[in-house]
């Protein structure tokens, strides 16, 4: 049924959907570089982490520890063993390091190598990723979520006018490295420029610039144009050069020939005027002396005679100063040009408030500000300053950061330079000043642009953890080097792996980004692996994140899904990767586009990041195109720079790959998504992830074509690794004999797939696989051979297709409630299996050992009937709450016995009172069947009968695998050898010495009958007369066979050894037992159900089939929904799905009616072709036999599957045509009759098939009741919540309600005996037992708590009770 879906999509698929968990697997592969030879490994990932810390030298430089290579060993337990035993799936990591010891020549100060010691060291275990992109940590499956954070680089921003009341913009810049100190540049209200290092106190930026070695003069010359003024006698002249541009003319400019005025005094000079002035051969222009006061000097002015400084640079000239200049006969002045409106004064003014004279002073000032407690010395201050931004060890801008900086500041620096340079900081300050002055080329950055946000995937996150651990280890190594004698030391004496292992295991166990995998169904697994989070270490926090960060941004198109995100406080902070998106090596998200050249769309595809996409003009995927690839139409709606524009075809240079590249996997599964309101689509995508896998899954009649892809990539189904023929198949395994082309010498050519049976998932849903191939069937590589949970025939099947009517029915669909037919419960359509795990441990306590046993004191035989001899519940037993699962006794503390008791005890050996019953019992609300029990025993402890039985069962399974594998390869070789030997003459006699039987005489003709009698171990002795080549071939085949059998035997023995070995248990635990109970949950009132369009509701009533509204032909509908749930919610997609679903169901029935009424042969085929209308399908029908066609049609009895891809789905006319084909009313409505009265309803009612899901919010998990139970110690009130077996809180509002009704006695009872009146509780219990009807409420305990609290505040409060 799922093999062919009628597809309504009009756009052909250009690019296959990439593997959906690629983001996880690729990232971890690049991190490990496991398959790369050590010498060829690139400097990132694990290799990069080691290289960044090694070599480690001691403080005196006498020795150095160098890193050579690492290798990853073999895994000890496979994935399933780790899950069962609660282990971490990890492999040993070994590193090769060498210790180099130097001798220093005292005279020449030269270092000579004295000694080199190289050694391989065990470096802890490194967790490995499973094929499904998850990690197994302590037996639970976890996912490392990728983090979306701000990319390193430089960012310019302003405060949007919020700081100052005047609304003036205050600009700032920030340089963010991957590792190291942040550098902030910011203006204040007076336009002074300040710098902050690591968000500490701000200081004038010039302190930092001076610390880098720039003098005041250098700074003025760098940031300003300098004018040269000559002084001759009483007059001053300005040099004619570039610095005059933008200034007013100091004097009239006349033509040298005619003397007429070309430019009047006061005219503003631009480049054209400057050129004309130079043409007049004017070299200087006379200035008015009044122009000079207030001009700022660009250099110091020295006395020509004494050399003393008359005026410092950055000083303003005064009228008196001009007189001094004339007096001293100074010939030339340099002044700075502050711009026409004197706006560019930031650096000049900042220099005025900065008191630093020399770079040394500036460095010490910075050290003082960042390290206030340490007294500075010039040396330490200099070292500290260099380490802030200029050294690789402490500062790393990363290649991404350097590239972004080059792009923004228009620099041309190699991306290998990952530290800051002085020039970078100067360029940043210059850009910030230009930005403030409104230079057109400068712009602020949008931090929500995906060019400024990058993804840290698993590999990078774990690499960072290794770095942190290695840096801690480095300190310890340096100390050890200085303390111990280097001559005798070996590398392993220095390296202690504990700090590294601790950091890595802490990350996997408790980091915010390492999450317990959402395993409700295959879709929730895939979505969890594709999730991007802005939270986590180094990211945002929920409280601080504003609206902008959460909002959808134009650059999200095709990269991040605009629909799928959680509702609530995390909205927009946790998002999902779009279907075709991928993360590139720098961590930026790319999306694919088809290239357009000269107006023609090419099949070539290119992936672009958000920055690369900025200047492209991109047409949508559904833009009509002619056969030659040129666009239809004169104007095309396209995207350019985040906006929608209409352009001519020649301007377009890219086209979207597919209409669904915009949304994520979960949203792609919603048919008619384009007709749903985005809020409802969001709920729809989120609720599909909560759908419980059903006992009998069914694929959706109306799908989108993505169902098969999701099922395949999720890892829930079993995919054939190689092509071959199914040799045998049963409920728990599939054996495939591979085709010869795929075999290698050591390979047996047999693939055995063990299916997962009834395993508990992280969310207590049932993970079960069942084979969908038959014995003798041929399978191709990549075919799906077994279905998993929530999959049907290799497609995702989260729910069921049910017949729905949109109408009101007796108020049972008020507020989105759902009315359901009893047929659905009867036929187990929405029945699901849930598996709960209960465990208990027998520990070694101070008072003695606990024991797991059937012999429990004071428990009757009735309660023990389900336990076996070992005290563990039997398989297949039905249990309910309170039943014993595992019998366990714990020693009690010794009580002081009287001498009589001691005597009695000595005589009768009475020991039972020394132990108490601590058995594992079924908790309240659980009722089901025991499906499995696992027993783990400590080393040295004896295995009980149950453990032995479990072990024998597992070994028998392995034995069966071994026998099958050996049988298949032996038969294959026997067949090949038989064909070679048949009809040949035997060259020697074949005798079985044990049985003394002659099988072949020399010279006999070899026949298949004779060969079949000869035992396998004698085949190698068969020789052929006069045919050496055949003999050699046979010998080679037999040798290969024995090799392969040896491999199989070795594998089997290794597995058996593992099974027999004792288990690693936590300290102090002797034995651990896990019991698994399967609970069958039928649909019942209170369960939550939903469609795929955000149409959710709670089941209000299960109605007998005969009362449901029914069609004219007597068929009742399955579900009744409220029609008012559609218009206000604007999810019209569900109505279109209803119509199309009805048509699909109707066509399936029509075809089967044709089959039943013997309309076979061509008529049936033509009908099929008319429905599917696809070339591929026609080929299939024409090639199929009559019987195959009938079988195919029979499968369609439930309806024909159709796919309506997102944004390219079925149109209204398509749906009408389908309804007509199925002979159904084209309105999609029908007259229904009331099941209670048989009367028709007034109007026609919209009916059809909807795919409905049962969600994980089941009423059985939520309903809870308590009479007596645990109480809080302080307040003596009942605890709260189902988990604590708590009571219902009676809050203020409830008290008011009781008061309003005057229910005084009930209220008094609520607040005293039913809550915290301890004495009253006991009294009322006694009264109930005796059958009396008295109630004496006393003083609530909370009153005493209040009194004590007041007394603790030194208020003397006491209650005086009257007698």
From Swiss-Prot:
Entry keyword set: DNA-directed RNA polymerase, Nucleotidyltransferase, Transcription, Transferase
GO terms classed as biological process: DNA-templated transcription
Keyword Magnesium annotated: no
Reactions catalysed: RNA(n) + a ribonucleoside 5'-triphosphate = RNA(n+1) + diphosphate
Gene3D superfamilies: 2.40.50.100, 2.40.50.150, 3.90.1100.10, DNA-directed RNA polymerase, beta subunit, external 1 domain, DNA-directed RNA polymerase, subunit 2, domain 6, RNA polymerase alpha subunit dimerisation domain, RNA polymerase Rpb2, domain 2
PROSITE patterns cross-referenced by the UniProt entry: RNA_POL_BETA
Name of a matching Pfam family: RNA_pol_Rpb2_1
E.C. number(s) listed in UniProt: 2.7.7.6
GO molecular function: DNA binding; DNA-directed RNA polymerase activity; ribonucleoside binding
InterPro entries according to UniProt: DNA-dir_RNA_pol_bsu_ext_1_sf, DNA-dir_RNA_pol_bsu_external_1, DNA-dir_RNA_pol_su2, DNA-dir_RNAP_su2_dom, DNA-dir_RNAP_su2_hyb_sf, RNA_pol_bsu_bac, RNA_pol_bsu_CS, RNA_pol_bsu_protrusion
One Gene Ontology CC term in the entry: DNA-directed RNA polymerase complex
Source domain of life: Bacteria
Role summary: DNA-dependent RNA polymerase catalyzes the transcription of DNA into RNA using the four ribonucleoside triphosphates as substrates.
Family matches, as PANTHER family: DNA-DIRECTED RNA POLYMERASE I SUBUNIT 2 (PTHR20856)
Assembly mode: The RNAP catalytic core consists of 2 alpha, 1 beta, 1 beta' and 1 omega subunit. When a sigma factor is associated with the core the holoenzyme is formed, which can initiate transcription.
Family: Belongs to the RNA polymerase beta chain family.
Protein name: DNA-directed RNA polymerase subunit beta
The organism of origin for this protein: Syntrophus aciditrophicus (strain SB)
Gene for this chain: rpoB
């Amino acid at each position: 049924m799922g093999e062919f879906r009628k597809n309504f999509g009009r756009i052909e698929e250009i690019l296959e959907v990439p593997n959906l968990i690629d983001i996880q697997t690729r990232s971890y592969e690049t991190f490990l570089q496991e398959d790369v030879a050590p010498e060829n490994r690139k400097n990132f990932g694990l290799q990069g982490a080691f290289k960044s810390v090694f070599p480690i030298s001691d403080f005196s430089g006498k020795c150095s520890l160098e890193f050579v290579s690492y290798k990853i060993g073999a895994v000890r337990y496979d994935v399933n063993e780790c899950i069962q035993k609660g282990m971490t799936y990890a492999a040993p990591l070994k590193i090769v390091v060498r210790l180099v010891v130097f001798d220093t020549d005292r005279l020449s100060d030269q270092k000579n190598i004295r000694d080199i010691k190289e050694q391989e060291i065990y470096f802890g275990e490194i967790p490995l990723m499973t094929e499904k992109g998850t990690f197994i940590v302590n037996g639970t499956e976890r996912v490392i979520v990728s983090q979306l954070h701000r990319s390193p680089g430089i960012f310019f921003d302003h405060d949007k006018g919020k700081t100052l009341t005047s609304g003036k913009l205050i600009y700032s810049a920030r340089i963010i490295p991957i590792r190291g100190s942040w550098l902030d540049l910011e203006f204040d209200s007076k336009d002074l420029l300040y710098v902050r290092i690591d968000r500490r106190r701000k200081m004038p930026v010039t302190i930092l610039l001076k610390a880098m070695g720039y003098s005041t003069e250098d700074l003025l010359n760098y940031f300003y144009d300098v004018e040269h003024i000559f002084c001759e006698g009483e007059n001053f002249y300005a040099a004619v050069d570039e610095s005059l541009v933008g200034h007013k003319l100091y004097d009239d400019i006349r033509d040298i020939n005619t003397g007429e005025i070309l430019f009047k005094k006061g005219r503003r000079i631009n480049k054209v005027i400057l050129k004309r002035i130079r043409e007049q051969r004017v070299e200087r222009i006379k200035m008015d002396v009044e122009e000079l006061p207030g001009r700022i000097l660009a250099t110091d002015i020295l006395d020509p005679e004494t050399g003393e400084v008359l005026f410092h640079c950055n000083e303003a000239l005064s009228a008196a100063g001009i007189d001094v200049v004339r007096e001293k006969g100074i010939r030339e002045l340099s002044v700075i040009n502050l711009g026409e409106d004197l706006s560019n004064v930031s650096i000049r003014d900042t220099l005025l408030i900065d008191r630093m004279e020399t770079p040394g002073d500036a460095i010490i000032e910075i050290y003082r500000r960042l390290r206030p407690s340490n007294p500075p010395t010039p040396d330490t201050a200099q070292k500290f300053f260099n380490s802030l931004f200029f050294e690789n060890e402490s500062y790393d801008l990363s290649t991404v950061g350097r590239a972004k900086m080059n792009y923004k500041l228009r620099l041309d620096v190699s991306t290998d330079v990952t530290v800051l340079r002085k020039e970078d900081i100067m360029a940043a300050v210059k850009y910030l000043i230009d930005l403030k002055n409104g230079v057109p080329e400068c712009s602020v950055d949008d931090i929500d642009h995906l060019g400024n946000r990058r993804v840290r995937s698993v590999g990078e996150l774990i690499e960072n953890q290794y770095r942190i651990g290695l840096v801690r280890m480095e300190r310890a190594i340096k100390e050890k080097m200085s303390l111990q004698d280097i001559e005798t030391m070996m590398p392993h004496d220095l390296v202690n792996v504990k700090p590294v292992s601790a950091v890595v295991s802490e990350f996997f166990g408790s980091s915010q980004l390492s999450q317990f995998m959402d395993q409700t169904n295959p879709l929730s697994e895939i979505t969890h692996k594709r999730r991007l989070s802005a939270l986590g270490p180094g990211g945002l926090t929920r409280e601080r994140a504003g609206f902008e960060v959460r909002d959808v941004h134009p650059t999200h198109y095709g990269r991040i899904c605009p629909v799928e995100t959680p509702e609530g406080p995390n909205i927009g902070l946790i998002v999902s990767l779009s279907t075709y998106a991928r993360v590139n090596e720098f961590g930026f998200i790319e999306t694919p586009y088809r290239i357009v050249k000269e107006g023609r769309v090419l099949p070539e595809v290119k992936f672009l990041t958000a920055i690369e996409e900025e200047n492209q003009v991109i047409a949508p995927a559904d833009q009509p195109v002619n056969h030659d690839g040129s666009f239809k139409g004169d104007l095309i709606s396209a995207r350019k720079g985040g906006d929608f524009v209409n352009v001519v075809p020649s301007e377009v240079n890219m086209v979207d790959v597919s209409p669904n590249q915009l949304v994520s996997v979960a949203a792609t599964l919603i048919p008619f998504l384009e007709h749903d309101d985005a809020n409802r689509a969001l709920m729809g995508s989120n609720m599909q992830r909560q759908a419980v896998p059903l006992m009998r899954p069914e694929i959706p009649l109306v799908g989108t074509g993505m169902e098969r892809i999701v099922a395949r990539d999720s890892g829930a189904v079993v995919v054939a690794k190689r092509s071959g023929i199914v040799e045998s198949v049963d409920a728990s395994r599939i054996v495939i004999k591979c085709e010869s082309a795929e075999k290698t010498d050591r390979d047996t050519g047999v693939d055995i797939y063990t299916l997962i049976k009834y395993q508990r998932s992280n969310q207590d849903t049932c993970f079960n696989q069942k084979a969908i191939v038959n014995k003798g069937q041929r399978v191709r590589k990549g075919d799906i051979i077994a279905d998993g949970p929530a999959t049907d025939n290799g497609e995702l099947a989260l729910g069921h297709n049910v017949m729905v009517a949109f109408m009101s029915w007796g108020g049972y669909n008020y507020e989105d409630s759902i009315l359901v037919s009893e047929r659905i419960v009867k036929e187990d359509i929405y029945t699901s299996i849930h598996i709960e795990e209960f465990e208990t441990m027998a520990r070694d306590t101070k008072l003695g050992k606990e024991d797991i046993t059937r012999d429990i004191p004071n428990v009757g035989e009735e309660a023990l009937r389900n336990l076996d001899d070992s005290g563990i519940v039997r398989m297949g037993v039905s249990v309910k709450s309170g039943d014993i699962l595992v019998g366990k006794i714990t020693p009690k503390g010794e009580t002081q016995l009287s001498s009589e008791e001691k005597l009695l005890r000595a005589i009768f050996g009475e020991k039972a009172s020394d132990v108490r019953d601590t058995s594992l019992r079924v908790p309240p609300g659980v009722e089901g069947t025991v499906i499995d029990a696992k027993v783990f025993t400590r080393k040295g402890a004896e295995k009980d009968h149950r453990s032995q039985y479990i072990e024998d069962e597992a070994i028998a399974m392995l034995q069966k695998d071994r026998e099958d594998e050996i049988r298949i390869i032996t038969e294959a070789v026997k067949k090949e050898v038989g064909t070679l030997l048949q009809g040949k003459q035997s060259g020697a006699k074949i005798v079985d010495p044990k049985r003394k039987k002659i099988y072949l005489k020399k010279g006999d003709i070899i026949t298949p009958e004779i060969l079949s009698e000869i035992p396998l171990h004698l085949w190698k002795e068969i020789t052929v007369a006069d045919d050496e080549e055949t003999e050699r071939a046979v010998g080679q085949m037999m040798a290969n066979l024995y090799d392969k059998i040896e491999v199989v035997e070795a594998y089997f023995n290794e597995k058996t050894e593992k099974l027999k070995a004792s288990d690693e248990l936590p300290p102090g635990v002797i034995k651990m037992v896990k019991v698994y109970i399967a609970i069958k949950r039928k649909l019942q009132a209170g369960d939550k159900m939903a469609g795929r369009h955000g149409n959710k509701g709670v089941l209000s009533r299960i109605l007998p089939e005969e009362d449901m509204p029914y069609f004219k032909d007597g068929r009742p509908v399955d579900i009744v929904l409220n029609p008012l749930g559609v218009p206000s919610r604007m999810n019209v997609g569900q109505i279109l799905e209803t119509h199309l679903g009805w048509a699909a169901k109707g066509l399936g029935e029509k075809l089967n009616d044709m089959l039943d009424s013997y309309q076979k042969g061509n008529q049936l085929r033509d009908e099929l072709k008319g429905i599917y209308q696809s070339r591929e399908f026609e080929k299939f029908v024409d090639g199929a036999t009559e019987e195959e066609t009938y079988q195919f049609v029979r499968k369609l009895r439930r309806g024909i599957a159709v796919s309506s891809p997102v944004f390219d789905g079925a149109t209204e006319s398509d749906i009408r045509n389908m309804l007509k084909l199925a002979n159904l009313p084209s309105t999609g409505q029908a007259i229904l009759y009331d099941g209670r009265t048989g009367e028709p309803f007034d109007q026609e009612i919209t009916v059809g098939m909807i795919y409905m899901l049962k969600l994980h919010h089941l009423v059985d998990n939520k309903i809870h009741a308590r009479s007596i139970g645990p109480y809080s110690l302080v307040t003596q009130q009942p605890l709260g919540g189902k988990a604590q077996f708590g009571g219902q809180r009676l809050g203020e509002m409830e008290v008011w309600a009781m008061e309003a009704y005057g229910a005084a006695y009930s209220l008094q009872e609520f607040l005293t005996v039913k809550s915290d009146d301890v004495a009253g509780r006991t009294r009322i219990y006694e009264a109930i037992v005796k059958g009396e009807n008295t109630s004496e409420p006393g003083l609530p305990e909370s009153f005493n708590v209040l009194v004590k609290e007041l007394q603790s505040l030194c208020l003397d409060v006491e209650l005086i009770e009257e007698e």
